[in-house]
């Protein structure tokens, strides 16, 4: 079984990208954190650690595709220095490639839109694993951690979709609109399947996916694809394409649910240095934990950011 990795990445500090974002986004959109706040685009080198972790802990990956917008992470010298005996091939894929035939929706600054199109990468294997650039592998993994004989592994738990929707209704609105949360996009996916009675509450882990699912589903439902990618910034009406695949495959008995407990190191870096120190000390005791998500490292203090990056480098075994 050939398995590829797909990483969606943007260097939001690139002046050209900043100008492009400002040209298409209103002041309200650009200052709404869950839609287009600056931390959604800012980079502190996460892509290097994500790619390095794949080489260290999943050398069986066939190829790494980095999906981006007219940018290049410049990984060659970093990989040559840290993996002198060879590394997994890396190819950068521009948004124009996966949006071919849908150019009217570019440029896009919307991770949901982009993730709805990654299956269109030319040459992508049937089995692929999707990463955000704030994810790393934190221990050795095998293909069986992601795929079964006839389907996929999903690190999630079932939640009653009606209760989740009710909870959302009781929460505050912000900036005159409903806040767009991870759960909200999952609920929208469930609605596509005739108001599915539950969602699979995914965690911040890599997502194992089948290319043919999207190819077939969107061939049968082309308008659904158009509606999900037409928004340049995140929109309350969008659905999570990964959740859609998992719900449908689960109905068919082709999606195996596994607990994320003891398998995920999650750190929300906005918190204090004391919190970060305690979290990293705890993480160090979990040697077999497979996945790491370091959310919004750019929001940590300078010292907190350094602690996180030093810990990641040590975990992966990188040179200074």
Language-model segment annotations:
Residues 12-40, 155:
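A solvent-exposed, charged loop/short amphipathic helix patch at secondary-structure junctions
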Residues 153-236:
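Long, charge-rich alpha-helical interaction segments
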Residues 13-17, 63, 72-77, 100-101, ...:
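Short catalytic/ligand-binding loop motif for oxyanion handling, primarily in non-cytosolic enzymes
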Residues 53-61:
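Short, acidic, metal-binding catalytic loop of nucleotide-sugar glycosyltransferases
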Residues 33-38, 42, 74-124:
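Active-site-proximal specificity loops/subdomain of glycosyltransferases
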Residues 200-320:
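A glycosyltransferase accessory/donor-loop signature
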Residues 4-13, 18-19, 95:
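Short loop/turn segments at strand-loop or loop-helix junctions that form parts
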Residues 72-73, 117-158:
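GT-A fold catalytic core of metal-dependent nucleotide-sugar glycosyltransferases
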């Amino acid at each position: 079984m050939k398995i590829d990795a797909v990483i969606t990445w943007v260097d939001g500090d690139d002046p050209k990208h900043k100008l492009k974002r400002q040209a298409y986004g209103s002041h309200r959109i650009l200052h709404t954190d869950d839609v287009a706040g600056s931390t959604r685009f800012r980079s502190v080198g996460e892509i290097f650690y994500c790619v390095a972790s794949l080489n260290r802990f999943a050398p069986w990956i066939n190829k790494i595709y980095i999906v981006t917008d007219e940018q290049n992470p410049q990984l060659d010298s970093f990989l040559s220095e840290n993996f002198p005996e060879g590394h997994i091939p890396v190819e950068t894929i521009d948004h124009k490639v996966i949006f071919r035939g849908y150019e009217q929706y570019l440029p896009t600054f919307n991770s949901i839109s982009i993730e709805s199109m990654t299956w269109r990468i030319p040459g992508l294997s049937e089995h692929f694993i999707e990463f955000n650039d704030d994810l790393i592998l934190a221990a050795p993994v095998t293909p069986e951690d992601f795929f079964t004989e006839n389907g996929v592994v999903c690190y999630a738990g079932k939640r009653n979709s009606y209760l989740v929707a009710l909870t959302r209704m009781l929460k505050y609105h912000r900036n005159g609109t409903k806040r767009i949360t991870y759960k909200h996009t999952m609920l929208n996916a469930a609605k596509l399947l005739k108001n599915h009675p539950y969602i699979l509450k995914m965690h911040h882990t890599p997502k194992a996916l089948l290319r043919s699912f999207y190819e077939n589903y969107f061939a049968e439902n082309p308008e659904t694809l158009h509606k999900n990618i037409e928004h340049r910034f995140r929109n309350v009406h969008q659905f999570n394409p990964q959740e859609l695949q998992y719900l449908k495959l689960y109905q068919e008995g082709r999606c195996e649910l596994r607990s994320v407990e003891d398998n995920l190191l999650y750190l929300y870096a906005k918190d204090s240095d004391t919190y970060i120190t305690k979290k990293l000390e705890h993480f160090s005791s979990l040697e077999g934990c497979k996945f790491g998500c370091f959310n919004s490292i750019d929001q940590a203090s300078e010292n907190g950011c350094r602690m996180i990056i030093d810990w990641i480098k040590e975990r992966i075994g990188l040179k200074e």
